[in-house]
Amino acid sequence: MKGRMRPYLPELTIRDYNTYMRYLRGVRRQMYKSYGFYACHLLRTNGVLFAILSDSLAGRMPTRKRQRVPGMLCRRSMMCQTLGIRQAAQTEILMGWHNLQDRKYSELRPAKRVRRAVDKLLLRRAYDKARQENPALERLFAQEREQAVVQMNLSAKNYALAAEPMSNVYGALYSTLATDDPNQRKSMRYIGSCIGRIFYLLDKAERFEADRRNGQYNVFVVNELNGQAAAIENARRQALAAVNDLMRAYKMLDLKLNDTLLNNIMILGLQHAVYPLEQDADTEKWEIP
């Protein structure tokens, strides 16, 4: 369940940059308040996107406050007190916990085995709390894991079939961010399904050599591609096609807030994640001095 969606910094306006950073700090502080300091390191940029999408589709204007950032002494401007931010914090905890289960202990190096053991010990309480707060979301992740096991046992050669579990869970996850409008929910489910398929293919392509060496199921290995470079090129080609499909559904959304920021993330940011638009764009500093 990996894969990050973040803005494409070279094309981001200062206003949108500030909005994004305030949401990032807001989600991190929500995780700190609800689940403890250690849980904050689970935050990935997907959670920030979930919060922005949820609030923007519903037209919820967040409260902006200057509060202390977890792990820092200084106070920064951040967004708070919205349903989208609370949903994002819950999602990051549950998704982070299930990511810990993705690889077997036997496949990890000793240092990573120790790190996983510490994570599972210290994050257990946060996971249990998030699961109780949002049992429906926990069921989504559990179903995805069960479907993934079935696909591994089948050793499916069909790319769409192999990506189906992750595509389904992302589709269901994104549909929860929509309002009660059935058309909006349908569009968000399709967008999430495309994103899940994109990140599944890219993740499997990057793990081509490791999975082949460890005898783990990998759809690119089953299709006998000639090395990791060929797998990555194949994954990028399929992912770009999924991005084009996603764009048609995304353009149908009625965004009430943050439309330019979301356009940057969903169009340029996603394309950059699939096929880098500019060298070293990811090494840009996020915090303006």
Question: Which residues are covered by each model-predicted region?
Answer:
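Acidic catalytic motifs of isoprenoid enzymes
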Residues: 1-190, 197, 201-239, 244-258, ...
